[in-house]
Amino acid sequence: MKVYFFDEVENTQELAISKFSSEPILIIARKQLKGRGRKGNDWENADQALACSFAFSLEKDHQNTSLLPLIAGYEFSSLYEEREVFLKWPNDLIVDEKKIGG
């Protein structure tokens, strides 16, 4: 897997798509200027937050991707052991009724 780190990018998702070939790719940025959320909504990076996008291809037999956002949210929540983390569809991480990631 190729991993790229940037101090600042326009959009991690667009960059991941443009750099993706056949090998999985992870784009991580300290600051994202023009992030997009679900349904094209603007996504703003909080200070001291990371923005990341992961791109990979699926085999034809495994193209049902409906659970992937929830699986990703679960995996990230399992890394956060200090507090109880709740998941909200599709991949939001909620602590003390506040979104901490997604």
Give the residues covered by each predicted segment.
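Catalytic palm active-site di-aspartate
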Residues: 83-97
